[in-house]
Swiss-Prot record:
It catalyses: deamido-NAD(+) + NH4(+) + ATP = AMP + diphosphate + NAD(+) + H(+). One of its GO terms (molecular function) is ATP binding. Signal peptide: none annotated. NCBIfam families: nadE, PRK13980.1. Catalyzes the ATP-dependent amidation of deamido-NAD to form NAD. Uses ammonia as a nitrogen source. This is NH(3)-dependent NAD(+) synthetase. The keyword NAD applies. It comes from the Archaea. It holds the Pfam family NAD_synthase. It is an enzyme of class 6 (ligase).
Length: 257
């Protein structure tokens, strides 16, 4: 895995937020390490008065307490909004059956609507919390948690986020908890991805950044080519999530007068 100077990484992330979000930000705080890290960085960059944290649970669990811990440690203003009535209303209005992944996508998009509603009313920007591991594998909801004005962690792998979090003082209990999108009880990122973040990041760095072949990666990491192919497939199949909608070109169809 690449070796970063994490002290300098923190400085650069803080400078990025300070330069691009002077008017203040709204952040969705889930109780996980990514959103906690962004909240800590933003507070360091802008001061606590320019941060609003939204805690938006669908069901009550320990994540809410962890999210409150982050906000209260930082002294930032925060609101707890129960999204269950909103999500359930949408679900009951549809004449199609939804599996739990589809329901999870609705939750993520409802949270996006709330974040932007507050950001618009306050004249602020939305800071995203996605990391590079999620971004490259498409492990986010399109127009949901993937939607933001700026994403400070977008080039920081998940295993690197843990290092940044430790440096800036995120509570150890949050750094060490199992990563979860909180979409349903017992859900974890690594179960859904089918691979640990530690191995995933090693594979992604070699596959995407170093552009090594599958054979080279498998040999270097002593893993099967099937695992490398699994990650490669995650990257390829989620390409549409990483770009704006596209359509066919028509410039060549101009009729000369």
């Amino acid at each position: 895995m690449r070796r970063l100077n994490f002290e300098k990484v923190v400085t650069r992330l803080v400078e990025f937020i300070k330069e691009n979000a002077k008017q203040g930000v709204v952040i969705g705080i889930s109780g996980g390490v990514d959103s906690a890290t962004v909240a800590y960085l933003a507070t360091k960059a802008l001061g606590k008065d320019k941060i609003l944290g939204l805690i938006m649970p669908y069901y009550e669990n320990k994540d809410v307490e962890d999210a409150k811990l982050v906000a209260e440690n930082l002294g930032i203003r925060y609101k707890i909004i129960n999204i269950k009535p909103i999500v359930d209303t949408i679900q009951s209005s549809l004449d199609v059956a939804l599996d739990r992944k589809s329901l999870g996508n609705i939750m993520a998009r409802v949270r996006m609507v709330l974040l932007y509603s507050y950001a618009n009313s306050l004249g602020r920007l939305v800071l995203g919390t996605s990391n590079r591991s999620e971004f490259l594998t498409g492990y986010f909801t399109k127009w949901g948690d993937g939607a933001s004005d700026y994403a400070p962690l977008i080039n920081i792998y998940k295993t690197e986020v843990w290092e940044v979090a430790r440096i800036i003082g995120v509570p150890q209990s949050i750094v060490e908890k199992k990563p979860s999108a909180g979409l349903w009880e017992g859900q974890t990122d690594e179960d859904e991805l089918g691979i640990s973040y530690k191995l995933l990041d090693e594979l992604l760095w070699r596959l995407v950044d170093l552009k090594m072949s599958k054979e080279e990666i498998a040999n270097e990491l002593n893993v099967s080519e099937e695992i490398v192919e699994h990650v490669e497939k995650l990257v390829k199949n989620s390409e549409h999530k990483r770009r704006l909608p596209i359509g066919p070109k028509v410039d060549d169809l101009i009729i000369e007068p």
